[in-house]
């Protein structure tokens, strides 16, 4: 596992960097998705409470018989009531509406894409009857660029009306939404704060992609090398998100971080866990099954943070990897830990 491929996509005059890397070594209320499972025995006007017994049971279930002591993660705080995880498995279509090459979200027109997503959700619910699967639209709201732009930041922020479109689509199918950010040569916190009005909604969550964070790589052009984000940068955003949760009386925010190499997040052990957040480390490398499982083992299983995610590529895991099909749901459910967030690109 010693090679990495970085693909830069030129789409509509923009450089859109996709997470197409070879592996190495909205308006539906999100609390309705999680709280129905998380909250037990309360009257209509009662203050929500967390079903900690069910939470513990599901966390042990996700550990999948691990005897190493890594999973479930020790000393993690219980989430605030209304938490989506581990009461639900998130099944997400990822992409950008300006590109049909960055992921499933954008690859097909809405009328074709939505039924495909819901079919994947149903198949996941059928494959794992213990944890309900729910749909998500995971939108790349800030994309890394191959040119510096007017401010020299090598990133492009999508117009708000694009995100409004995604929120409207999500409302139609009771899906949650992720805003995903590739910062280029910008700083992480201000790029996240740019979308505060959306992150203040209960059904909108955050994803960040260290692959295209270039400040820790000498400020080189995104796509030339794999980028990096430190735990300190991640924690700064975590503190900000936790503040939004408290200020707006929201259920916990999911905070998803892409990872397929050690250097993308060199110090995951220092990521701070908070009741207001649910941290998902998403293994998003592509390739044949043995390569993907190895990457998952090294950077997810052996370096636990809180929750685990797994990305599947409709094209890169098959045509570009010499495989007839992607890894099956049964194969993924056999991993330790079981991934609770599934992303399709």
Predicted regions and their residues:
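Substrate-binding surface in catalytic domains of secreted glycosidases
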Residues: 210-250
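Active-site beta-loop-alpha junctions enriched in small/polar residues
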Residues: 96-98, 140-144, 182-184, 211-213, ...
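C-terminal motif of bacterial Sec signal peptides marking the signal peptidase cleavage site
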Residues: 15-18
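Aromatic-lined carbohydrate-recognition surfaces of secreted/lumenal glycan-active proteins
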Residues: 183-188, 246-264
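Substrate-binding cleft of extracellular glycoside hydrolase catalytic domains
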Residues: 123-125, 132-211
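Bacterial N-terminal signal peptides that target proteins for export
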Residues: 1-7
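Acidic, His- and aromatic-enriched active-site or binding-groove loops in soluble protein domains
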Residues: 162-163, 196-210, 231-235, 276-291
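Alpha/beta catalytic barrel-like cores
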Residues: 20-156, 273-277, 291-299, 303-345
């Amino acid at each position: 596992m010693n090679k990495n491929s970085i693909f830069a996509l030129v789409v509509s005059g923009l450089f859109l960097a996709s997470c197409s890397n070879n592996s190495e070594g909205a308006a539906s209320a999100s609390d309705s998705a999680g709280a129905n499972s998380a909250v037990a025995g309360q009257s209509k006007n009662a203050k929500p409470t967390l079903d900690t017994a069910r939470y513990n049971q599901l966390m042990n279930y996700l550990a999948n018989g691990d005897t190493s002591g890594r999973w479930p993660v020790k000393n993690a705080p219980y989430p605030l009531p209304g938490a989506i995880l581990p009461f639900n498995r998130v099944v997400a279509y990822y992409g950008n509406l300006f590109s049909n090459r960055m992921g499933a979200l954008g690859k097909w027109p809405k009328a074709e894409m939505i039924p495909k997503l819901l079919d994947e959700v149903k198949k996941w619910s059928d494959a794992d009857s213990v944890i309900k699967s729910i749909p998500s639209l995971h939108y790349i709201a800030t994309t890394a660029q191959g040119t510096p732009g007017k401010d020299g930041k090598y990133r492009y922020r999508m117009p708000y009306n694009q995100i409004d479109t995604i929120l409207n689509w999500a409302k139609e199918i009771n899906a949650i939404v992720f805003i995903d950010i590739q910062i280029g040569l910008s700083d992480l916190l201000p790029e996240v704060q740019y979308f505060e009005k959306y992150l203040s909604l209960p059904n909108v969550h955050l994803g960040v992609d260290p692959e295209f964070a270039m400040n820790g790589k000498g400020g080189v052009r995104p796509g030339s090398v794999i980028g990096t984000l430190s735990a300190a940068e991640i924690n700064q955003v975590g503190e900000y998100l936790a503040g939004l949760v408290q200020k707006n009386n929201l259920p916990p925010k999911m905070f998803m971080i892409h990872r397929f190499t050690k250097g993308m997040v060199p110090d995951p052990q220092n990521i701070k866990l908070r009741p207001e957040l649910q941290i998902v480390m998403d293994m998003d490398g592509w390739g044949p099954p043995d390569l993907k499982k190895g990457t998952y083992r090294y950077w997810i299983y052996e370096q636990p943070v809180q929750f685990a995610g797994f990305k599947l590529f409709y094209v890169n895991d098959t045509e570009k990897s010499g495989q007839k099909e992607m890894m099956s749901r049964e194969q993924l459910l056999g991993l330790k830990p079981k991934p609770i967030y599934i992303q399709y690109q």
